[in-house]
């Protein structure tokens, strides 16, 4: 069953299902699903109960320790501390041929591709080749109707040079990808590289309602490993980097953006997650209530349109989006077993910049 996969008018899909084309406004849905699941592959799980090649759902840090061992559970704990509802853990099989690490990542991507989750993150540092492979995987999944965010990070060396972190953001440019470029200092003084803190950010994104932004969210840490000047922060933002800043006695996320950003426009995590929710919920509702169950005639089409519109109006009422519109397509004829519906809405963002003119 297709689940919001892309469609092409010159090569229509064969399988029954709902297919979505995003034209800078998007396909939509009908019943909000759980959005707080973070997926993480764990490569070392000695001392725990995990079995190689198996998936596990964790909702408590103590269960994570039991599963993968105390020494390996930090990524799971950080995801939950960030606010995720659940952690989908995959016990990655050990390499049969040590030199063939690329196959290990390809295989784990294939394993995760058929699981349900909202945000993906690695437990620690990966190399540039795997980053590129993961970016391609995110895009491939999106084209097949699987929508999730990927949170990336770097090692301590790249955290010490914002130019390097920004270059990674540019290389990972995608509306579904977030790149953390700031290492952090925990409350106990421990320095943590951005790749190791990325699980906390993944949990924060997953646990934040889709009508809220993570911009200026305060983090439970003491400092960052590299404080940036204003000009450096601005350059990082236009490069698509997620930056953490020391703001007086607080440490905050500067702006909740994706790597799909430039000098004039920032891709927002909030609007991307709203789009993903719509693209995920609509196919589920269509599959459960409409596909194969209504006639392709005016009354059946009207029922489908009304359901889609009602869902979007619910999101509008929750300040997720504005101005939803649903109608039969005027460009394609709905006949046989095919229905073409145009859905549009306006993104709703948070107030993030306030400009004052003070006269005295």
Please place each PLM-identified region on the residue numbering.
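Surface-exposed assembly/interface segments
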Residues: 1-360
């Amino acid at each position: 069953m297709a689940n919001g996969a892309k469609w092409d008018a010159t090569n229509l899909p064969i399988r029954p299902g709902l297919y979505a084309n995003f034209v800078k406004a998007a396909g939509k849905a009908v019943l909000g699903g759980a959005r707080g699941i973070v997926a993480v592959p764990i490569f070392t799980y000695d001392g725990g109960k995990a079995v190689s090649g198996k998936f596990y759902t964790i909702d408590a840090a103590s269960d994570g320790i039991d599963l993968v061992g105390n020494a390996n559970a930090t990524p799971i704990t950080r995801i939950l501390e960030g606010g995720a509802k659940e952690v989908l853990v995959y016990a990655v099989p050990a390499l049969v041929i040590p030199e063939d690490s690329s196959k290990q990542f390809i295989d784990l991507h294939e394993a995760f591709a058929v699981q349900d989750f909202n945000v993906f993150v690695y437990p620690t540092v990966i190399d540039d080749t795997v980053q590129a492979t993961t970016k391609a995987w995110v895009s491939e999944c999106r084209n097949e109707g699987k929508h999730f965010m990927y949170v990336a990070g770097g090692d301590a060396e790249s955290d010490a040079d914002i130019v390097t972190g920004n270059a990674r953001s540019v290389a990972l440019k995608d509306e579904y990808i977030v790149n953390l470029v700031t290492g952090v200092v925990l409350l106990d003084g421990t320095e943590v590289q951005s790749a190791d803190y990325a699980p906390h950010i993944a949990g924060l994104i997953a646990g934040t309602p889709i009508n809220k932004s993570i911009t200026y969210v305060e983090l439970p840490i003491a400092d960052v490993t590299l404080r940036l000047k204003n000009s450096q922060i601005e350059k990082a933002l236009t490069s698509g980097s997620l930056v953490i800043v020391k703001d007086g006695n607080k440490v905050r996320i500067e702006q909740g953006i994706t790597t799909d950003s430039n000098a004039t426009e920032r891709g927002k995590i909030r609007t991307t997650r709203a789009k993903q929710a719509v693209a995920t919920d609509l196919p589920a509702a269509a599959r459960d209530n409409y596909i194969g169950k209504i006639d392709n005639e005016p009354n059946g089409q009207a029922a489908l349109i009304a359901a889609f519109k009602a869902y979007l109006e619910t999101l509008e009422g929750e300040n997720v989006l504005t101005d939803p519109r649903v109608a039969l397509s005027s460009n394609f004829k709905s006949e046989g077993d095919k229905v073409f519906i145009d859905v549009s809405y306006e993104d709703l963002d948070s107030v993030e910049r306030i400009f004052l003119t003070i006269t005295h």
